[in-house]
């Protein structure tokens, strides 16, 4: 949760386009390791489920709508205590990014990290740089510095 930027009350949600796929992979015996073998499993499983019926996209959209657009369910009172609700969806494939951008009228942000880019080996990550993002942020420092920058970025965009 991010809150307290000046007088704005901001609630942040983070989702992953592969979150539901990870849950299914655990049920199928995945050990949770994000080594090359594990990343390839998740990437391949997501690809198959997308090709079959766009299941990862549909499930992520359902989750986003449940939490960020509450109606009669229990989170409504809690969420309405905030002035703004920000949703971040971690997705890497350009064609998938386009679907989320269209579905939610969203802005896109690429957080680049030279170390992570050097390790790109699976199908899902290969196309991440082949997209025209609305914003590009370089993360070549510590996680704490990235969090500070993110707070400033959110303040500038919301405030």
Where are these regions (language model features)?
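Structural recognition of the conserved hydrophobic beta-strand(s) that form the central parallel beta-sheet
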Residues: 86-90
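Small-molecule kinase domains that catalyze NTP-dependent phosphoryl transfer to phosphate-bearing small molecules
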Residues: 95-103, 107-159
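ATP-dependent small-molecule kinase phosphotransfer cores
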Residues: 8-85
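Fold-independent oxyanion-binding glycine-rich loops
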Residues: 17, 91, 140
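Short alpha-helical
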Residues: 20, 94-95
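A conserved segment at the C-terminal end of the G1
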Residues: 1-8
